[in-house]
């Protein structure tokens, strides 16, 4: 008995719809719902769709906000540069310069990032006098000096810090120059000592060579002219010449 086609089929799919057998070929049935879609109700599917659309809208909104923020920042920078004249001088921070004791020049010395403090001649004189008395101020002294100068205590503190740094730098330069001169003097003295040592060694070697060439030391002529001997048997004085022979005998004798 031949099997009959009952139209039953088994398949798995997501959002693809069902398949129906029609003879030997399989054709897709768009009208039939997918097995996964049948598991959820229409209300749940609408919530999922709304959540997806909401997330996409938030991403687009955040992206547009970032672009607007970047555009606004660029506009603010360009506006500040245009207002400051192109060199950023109006946006510099007012701070105490390194040469505050000299009155300052009013122009930033650190690459155009800082502006030196303008000090009057009286303020500079008072600061220098105070520094010569006390190079480090206490809290009360700092506030009192700031009140006299009509400055902020922080400005006075920074001026003293810079003044101490300049003093230390100048002292270091003086010490360095002194040590440099000492080093040059010692180097010259070392060269002279080496030259003298070489001269002494040369003289010593020459003297040693001269002493080695003469094995015997000659006596003076006055000492070698005559040698007087006394004969113990006859008690006569015998004068011996340089050759060792008798040159003459004395006739005188010594009595005891």
Swiss-Prot record:
One Pfam family cited in the UniProt record for this chain: Homeodomain
Residue ranges with Gly residues bias: 102-112
Swiss-Prot/TrEMBL keywords: DNA-binding, Homeobox, Nucleus, Transcription, Transcription regulation
Subcellular location: Nucleus
Residue span of region Disordered: 52-117
Region span, Leucine-zipper: 170-214
Tissue expression as described in the entry: Expressed in roots, leaf sheaths and blades and panicles.
Source domain of life: Eukaryota
Protein task: Probable transcription factor.
Family of the protein in this entry: Belongs to the HD-ZIP homeobox family. Class II subfamily.
Name of this chain's protein: Homeobox-leucine zipper protein HOX18
Organism ancestry: Eukaryota, Viridiplantae, Streptophyta, Embryophyta, Tracheophyta
């Amino acid at each position: 008995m031949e099997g009959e086609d009952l139209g039953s089929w088994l398949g798995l799919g997501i959002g693809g719809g069902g398949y129906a057998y029609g003879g030997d070929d399989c054709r897709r049935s768009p009208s039939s719902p997918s097995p996964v879609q049948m598991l959820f109700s229409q209300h749940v599917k609408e919530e999922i769709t709304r959540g997806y659309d909401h997330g996409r809208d938030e991403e687009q909104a955040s992206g547009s906000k970032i672009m607007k923020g970047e555009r606004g920042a660029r506009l603010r920078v360009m506006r500040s540069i245009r207002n400051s004249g192109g060199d950023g001088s109006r946006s510099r921070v007012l701070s105490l310069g390194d040469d505050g004791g000299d009155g300052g020049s009013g122009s930033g010395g650190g690459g155009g990032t800082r502006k030196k403090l303008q000090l009057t001649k009286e303020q500079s004189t008072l600061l220098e006098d105070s520094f010569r008395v006390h190079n480090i101020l206490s809290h009360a002294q700092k506030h009192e000096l700031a009140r006299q100068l009509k400055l902020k205590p922080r400005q006075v503190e920074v001026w003293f810090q810079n003044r101490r740094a300049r003093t230390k730098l100048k002292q270091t330069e003086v010490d360095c120059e002194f040590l440099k001169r000492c080093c040059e003097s010692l180097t010259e003295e070392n060269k002279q000592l080496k030259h003298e040592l070489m001269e002494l060694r040369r003289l010593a070697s020459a003297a040693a060579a001269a002493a080695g060439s003469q094995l015997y030391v000659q006596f003076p002529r006055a000492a070698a002219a005559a040698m007087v001997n006394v004969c113990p048997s006859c008690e006569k004085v015998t004068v011996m010449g340089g050759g060792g022979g008798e040159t003459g005998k004395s006739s005188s004798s010594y009595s005891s």
